[in-house]
């Protein structure tokens, strides 16, 4: 994590002030009436995905009483370990106690739950952000039959499996997988080694800018994917049970940050660039402008988990009962409280 410069601090602080969580705003008074967090050090994952935007608002987290905010790099080794366990890569970091909170793709969370990982989902963060790209002659999911599909993690195969099963394909025999965490699927596509691949921000914006292939399915616009959360916020189950005040305070800061992503995308994009999370302001702004961060008050996160869990179960990718997994690995108390407190 780069050292925070004065300019970065001022940008972060200005955005924090815009939320009303600092100073003597209404939320500042609410914070003062609550007990302090049981722990003041918290850890998040750090990766290149624009989806992490709500996690980087250090001043919002500091306003909640956290004095030591750490970011742990997500690496290729994390992906390989998760692949071996049939778990979601970032959720696997939570399960191993390497981070306290992280955003993770909903199907990956279900895989980690099924693998026995001690993760607890707290909230949805935003709706769809990924798109499936393919060669020009591939016009639909059904056209993937007999093709080669690239992913950088085995967990991505789970998503494509449930998507293609809806159109009658059996991914185990109808197309060939190429999965390598050390390679970018986009590069393999350019080299002609694969016929289709998934892209998420910021790679998604680069694919568009370079006019590489075309969109087969977009979770941003195409149902049912556009109607469900893409990334969700999760914590270690032990953390949520041991530190309920800290858990609520972290969630509040991140949901306020999500509001800022929706209302101030230009300022948030600038912050991400200044803090070294991404290099391209234009790609980041495009992603923040498209991704729906404004839905956490209205969309039910449990609906998303149940939708993906049922499809994963039908595909034989998870063994446990979807209802049991959701009952054991979710805690909506904090979200319900914050929906009442942070009315739009």
How should each PLM-predicted stretch be described?
Residues 33-172, 176-181, 188, 195-201, ...:
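Short, glycine-/small- and polar/acidic-enriched structural segments
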Residues 2, 8-29:
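N-terminal export signals
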Residues 13, 17, 126, 148, ...:
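A general structural motif at alpha-helix termini
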Residues 62-66, 221-226, 292-301:
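Short, solvent-exposed loop/beta-turn-alpha elements that line the ligand-binding surface or hinge
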Residues 107, 184-274:
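Pocket-lining segment of extracytoplasmic ligand-binding domains
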Residues 92, 142, 158-162, 187, ...:
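Solvent-exposed, polar/charged alpha-helical surfaces in well-ordered, non-transmembrane soluble domains
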Residues 242-320:
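Secondary-structure end/capping motifs
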Residues 313-344:
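Conserved C-terminal helix/tail region of periplasmic/extracytoplasmic solute-binding proteins
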